[in-house]
Amino acid sequence: MELHNDEKRLLKAFQESNEKIMNLEELSKYIEKEKVMRAAFWLSGRDFLEIIENKTKICELTELGNQSLDLGIPERKVANYIKENNLESIPIKDLSKILEKDETGAALGNLKKKGLVAIDKGNIVFKDLDYVDIEEEVLKKASEDFNLSNYSEDEVKIIENLKKRGFLKINEVVDRSFELKNAGIDFIKKPIEIKEEITQLTREMIVSGKWNDYFIRPYDAKIPTEELYPAKAHPMSKIIQEVNEVLISMGFKEVKSQIVQTEFWNFDTLFEPQDHPARDMQDTFFVKYPNTGTVPKDLLEKVKGIHECGTIGDEKISKGWCYNFDENVSERTVLRTHTTVSSIKYLASLSECERENAQKVFCIDRVFRNEAIDYKHLPEFYQCEGIVMAEDVNFDNLVGILKEFLQKLGFEKVRIRPAYFPFTEPSLEAEVYMEGKGWLELLGAGIFRPEVLEPFGIKKPVLAWGIGLSRLAMLRLGLTDIRELHKNDMQWLKKTVISEE
């Protein structure tokens, strides 16, 4: 094992001084101070020595603190003013004549807190103008003795208060010493030879042959290095990006919609009855302003007919829901509860010519549910939803698309189970298998019912599916509480890696 020259110089310092423990100042007599820590870090990784850190808190007066040593803290300024002007008291409103604007409130508060004054009809009356202020005494001591370990527990509390008031600041100083371990002791028992070394060859060295005179230092990939945590995207953002890239690779294009939607687009167009529990205030965020929105009248009439009796004009689609549809309810605004509204609005925007072509779109965005926050529910979360519209697609195609999508996200084992959703028929749930957890439900899907598509003049089958990305993130990151995704835990954010599966 060949050591770096700086490592050798550091060990030679121990050899020549015949010491087992040395500090930074002592070692800097043998090797440049800026190189000591680097060499010591390398040697500690080789188990040659141990770096011992002794942390000390020291206090340092600020500019305000130094001024207060000469002029007094604000409370003392008030006392001195009264004393110098032979006054018995001073009106509170006159404090601004003595103190800076930002000192006035704090000075009055501290005078009362310390029990130095009484307030009589808006006047400040000192009980003793020659009082002793422990804060002033500690401030003076801090100007001479910086080491907090020399202060009593009560004095440290006063130091903390002086820090809050801006008179001083507290810094942490780290003193390091270096102790040889057995491997290092064994190494310095032998002569230490330091050769001139180089880390790279130049053309001149090669042409002249001088490279033979140097020792070329080999690279050691096993030497421990300091961990670096460069800026990176949040794990949730990485998962959103990954899902986006997977869907684009599968031939989908992304669409968007507004966060605030009318109930018409969010519920009515999906054949969800107006008395459905999902529309209750405990499940949906209703917008206070604007509390209504514009609804296209021609589509409203068609959707209304579908809801009431399952007809569009003279064409019978189904039985409908058999209730009186309220157009005023359709105009109410809500925070969207799903991203399916993006696909529905996209389908509604298609021209007659565009409806003849196959369509594959998806949306990844935030949705909102008025739910109590717990380990698996948040009022705001990301959802991904997609549709495929084509002449010859069927349930088997839907299953194939979902399996391909989930496998591209790293889930090899996928199974399909029957399910119910109000706007698709047939419907399914896709489950994925994870070691140690078993089968877990991940997404819902189905084929849009005719009641959803007919108002837009769409006759082709439309496959639809949706997945909660927070749920996906929990599975990928091994989390048991959805709230952990949004905590400001810097260590977790630094060290979390999204596996490239």
UniProtKB/Swiss-Prot annotation:
InterPro entries assigned to the protein according to its UniProt record, in alphabetical order = aa-tRNA-synth_II, aa-tRNA-synth_II/BPL/LPL, Phe-tRNA-synth_IIc_asu, Phe_tRNA_ligase_alpha_bac/arc, Phenylalanyl-tRNA_Synthase
| A biological process term (GO) from this entry | phenylalanyl-tRNA aminoacylation
Question: Which EC class does it fall in?
Answer: ligase
The places in or outside the cell where this protein is found are:
Cytoplasm
- Name one cellular component (GO) term: cytoplasm
Record-linked CDD domains: PheRS_alpha_core (cd00496)
Give the cofactor binding note: Binds 2 magnesium ions per tetramer.
Q: Where does Mg(2+) bind?
A: 425
Name the chain's protein. Phenylalanine--tRNA ligase alpha subunit
The species this protein was found in: Methanococcus maripaludis (strain C5 / ATCC BAA-1333)
